[in-house]
Amino acid sequence: MTTAPAIVTEERQVELAAAELSRRIPGAAVKACEPMARHTTFRIGGPADIYVQPLDLEQLAEVMRFAREHGLPVKVVGNGSNLLVGDGGIRGIVVRLAPSFSGVQWLDDGVLAGGGARLGKLVKDSGEAGLSGLESTVGIPGTVGGALAMNAGTDTGCIGDLVMSAMMLEESGEIREWDETQLAYKYRHSGIRAAKVTVLSARLRLRPAPPEEIRAKIERLRQKRAGRQPLTAWSAGSAFKNPRGVAAGKVLHRAGAKGMRVGEAQVSSKHANFLINRGRARAAEMKELIERAHALALRRYGIDLELEIETVGE
């Protein structure tokens, strides 16, 4: 009597791949089928096949080699802000930079910050160091790498205005310095996303100023944002990019989008360009809400709003 061959399920294949990667980068956190809802500010998202936090550059390069060997796509995430992960999750490998990629070195004309450095902390620390310029990013969640990729900013400026150069880990595994031309900054756009590179560090141009003046400006901007945006809600930040000459939030507010709801996904009653998870929202609900808000602006004003939130996964 012959024994039927064991059937290796897709989930088991993922577990085996994760175990192999874990052996190659000892000490790093490697998880199979990790829910991305735990790692996004929306608190939404199905499982990543493999979720990994490499401890250093050598391990990060090894992750990239492993991905190439196995033909796996790689998605690098920062703090998980500005990100909507599908309910079916993300195939391949999701990389989140560990705290060892968060180093900061103060310079005479600015700062050299690791790609994993928290933007909010960098804003505060730059003020204490008497270096001004980052105040325009007050209240924006996420990491330096994520902020560079989307050219994060507010109505007072964008981080791309400050970037002198950045060190990138390219898909090939090579490390290269990118200048302002390669970064190609425009409103909520950079050359980083299309190139599929990982931001290792960035040099930002700042200017000296009295710390007390910077602290006062930071506090004014923080209070302004807290007064009109749902900063404590589960959100991914601004949903749509501002069209030329008008704020997306104003368009949606006038169109009557505030409070609009699909299941547990809702347009904030505080700011119409912020979508919030009321508790157990699914990505499908959030996507339907996005479509409805977009259709409303198009129908009422003929404005074709462009999504600012990045949607990934299945």
Give short role names for the model-derived ranges.
Residues 158-160:
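Short loop/turn motifs at secondary-structure junctions and domain boundaries
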Residues 127, 146-156, 176, 182, ...:
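Core subunits and conserved enzymes of cellular information-processing
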Residues 2-6, 31-32, 40, 83, ...:
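Phosphate/pyrophosphate- and phosphate-bearing ligand-binding catalytic cores of soluble enzymes
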Residues 10, 14-144, 152-154:
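Anion-binding (especially nucleotide phosphate/pyrophosphate-binding) glycine-rich loop
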Residues 51, 112, 165-167, 201-203:
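Beta-strand secondary-structure signal
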Residues 70, 77-79, 162, 233-234, ...:
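Short, basic and Ser/Thr-rich N-terminal targeting/leader segments
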Residues 102-104, 164-168:
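Short polybasic amphipathic segments
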